[in-house]
Structure formats: structure tokens, C-alpha cells
Design a protein with these regions (language model features):
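Alpha/beta-hydrolase active-site loop
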Residues: 145, 155, 175-194
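N-terminal cap/lid subdomain of alpha/beta-hydrolase-fold enzymes
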Residues: 74-175
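Active-site nucleophile loop of the alpha/beta-hydrolase fold
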Residues: 155, 233-245
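Sec-dependent N-terminal signal peptides
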Residues: 19-28
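Catalytic-loop region of hydrolases
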Residues: 35-98
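Conserved small/polar residues in nucleotide/adenosyl-binding loops
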Residues: 269-271
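Glycine-rich nucleophile elbow surrounding the catalytic serine of serine-hydrolase chemistry
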Residues: 208-221
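Alpha/beta-hydrolase fold nucleophile elbow
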Residues: 199-211
Length: 271
């Protein structure tokens, strides 16, 4: 009986201990989820690095942060998250190109161009674009950082970019969500960024991937007309042409699908 009582006491203590731990975990979890995520409107962090591009050492700084968007009254209404790579072993950057890179979607983050194409590091993937185990990243020997500084920008509601002012869905759409609205606030943001980093003398380029092709075309016009920023060039990476893609009676989709139909037919023959 004494042994049974000791076992029962041990079970009771173990049960109470578990209940206490569960209570603490629930308390912490409730506090964590009840707190609203706060994103600073204007902040940055700079670190120093070096990499190898085309068998040559390149020293550079990486600046990550957020930069505000203001309304006509000077109130902060939103903030855009960005990553800025700048080569640091160059004495004069007045002739060094500055590139602003955008992905498509239009709701796609800049991480795809950042870690998949032009940044100093890239994901470990095969020739078809699939990840290779063990998963990770590596130095990108094809990065363009050796010849140009790069700013990867996340538009509103992408990545850590957020609307900070409370507004209705209709107000947000009128301000941010549309081809022209997109170009307008991005142009204002770019003008501020170039002023802050003192890069007005630098040659400036835009890179747009997929829908980013449409974005940078509209942005180039907006920059020239309303920000007095004249670009030196625009780079389109597999740009999307939605009018051509969905044009009634067009031949683009049938031509693209033809190879897949042929491969399917050949595979059926061998079954």
C-alpha cells in the first residue's frame, strides 16, 4: 500500500507540473499573439561584406531597412522595405550605375531577383531552378554587383512593406493598388531614396521581372514627368504582356503549348 501511495503522489506531482507548464505556455502564447506587429517606418542597418564575382574580390556594404511614404500633408502613411547593396572599394560613385530591381505578381517579393539572379548570394538550385539538398545559399558568381549597385524594393503589402495609416479598402486602392498608383508612390519613394543616398549623379536603371516589366515602364514615365529623374535604361526580365497573352484568337499560347502536346503524344506512343 505504501508503494502504491508513493506512485500516486508521484503521478499527482507530475500532473500538476504539466498543468503548470501548459498554463505558462498558454499565457506566453496569448501575449505573443495579442501583440500587434509593429514595423518601423524609417530605419536601416548597414553591414560590411566581401564576395568573389568573376574571380575577383568585391567589397560591399549591405543596407536593409524601411523608408516612409508621405501624404500631401507630410504625414507618414506607409513604409517600403528594401535591401541596398553598394560596392565600397570605389572612390567615386558618380559614374557607377544604380539599379532598382522589382519582381512581378504584382504581389511578388523582390527575393526572387535578389536570391535567384542578381544579388551577391543565390540559393543552391539546379539548372531547372529546383532546390538542391542540403538546402542553403552560395556566393553568386554572376551577380551584377561588380559593375552596379543594386536596390531590391518590395512594394506595398509585400515583404515587410506596409500601409501604416488606417484607411478603408477603397482609400488604399485609390492610393496604392493600380498601375498608375503603383508607379506614382514608387517614383516618390525612389526620389527620396536617391536624395538620401546622394546618388543623383549616378546613372540609374530599372529592372523588372514578369509583371515588373509593366511596372517599370509606368515607373519610368512617372519618374521623368513628375520627379525629374531621367533614367539611363530599363532592363526587362521575361516581361509579362497580358494583352498579348490573353488576346482572343492569338497564336502565342498554342505555340507555347505545342512542345508539351508533342512530348505528351510521344510518351503515349511508348506506353
Amino acid at each position: 500500500m505504501k508503494i502504491l501511495k508513493l506512485k500516486q503522489d508521484h503521478i499527482n506531482k507530475y500532473t500538476m507540473k504539466n498543468k503548470f507548464l501548459i498554463f505558462i505556455i498558454m499565457l506566453i502564447s496569448t501575449g505573443s499573439f495579442s501583440q500587434e506587429r509593429i514595423i518601423s517606418a524609417d530605419t536601416s542597418k548597414i553591414t560590411k561584406h566581401s564576395t568573389i564575382i568573376l574571380n575577383k574580390k568585391v567589397n560591399y556594404s549591405a543596407q536593409i531597412g524601411t523608408q516612409p511614404i508621405w501624404d500631401v500633408e507630410g504625414q507618414v502613411i506607409a513604409t517600403l522595405h528594401y535591401t541596398y547593396y553598394k560596392r565600397t572599394d570605389i572612390n567615386d560613385d558618380s559614374n557607377r550605375p544604380l539599379i532598382f530591381s522589382f519582381n512581378g505578381g504584382p504581389g511578388s517579393a523582390s527575393i526572387w531577383m535578389h536570391m535567384g539572379y542578381t544579388g551577391p548570394y543565390s540559393l543552391t538550385i539546379d539548372d531547372e531552378g529546383y532546390p538542391i539538398q542540403p538546402y542553403g545559399y552560395k556566393t553568386n558568381p554572376y551577380s551584377i554587383l561588380d559593375v552596379a549597385d543594386i536596390v531590391f524594393v518590395n512594394p506595398i503589402n509585400i515583404g515587410y512593406s506596409r500601409i501604416l495609416k488606417k484607411m478603408s479598402k477603397e482609400e488604399a486602392t485609390d492610393k496604392f493598388f493600380g498601375v498608375n498608383q503603383d508607379a506614382k508612390y514608387l517614383a516618390e519613394w525612389m526620389s527620396t531614396f536617391v536624395s538620401r543616398t546622394e546618388r543623383w549623379k549616378s546613372p540609374k536603371y530599372l529592372v523588372g521581372e514578369s509583371y515588373g516589366g509593366i511596372r517599370v515602364m509606368a515607373l519610368a514615365s512617372e519618374l521623368q514627368q513628375n520627379q525629374w529623374m531621367y533614367l539611363n535604361g530599363v532592363v526587362l526580365v521575361s516581361p509579362a504582356d497580358y494583352e498579348l497573352r490573353y488576346e482572343s484568337g492569338g497564336i502565342i499560347l498554342p505555340v507555347v503549348d505545342f512542345l508539351y502536346f508533342t512530348a505528351t503524344a510521344l510518351s503515349l506512343i511508348h506506353i
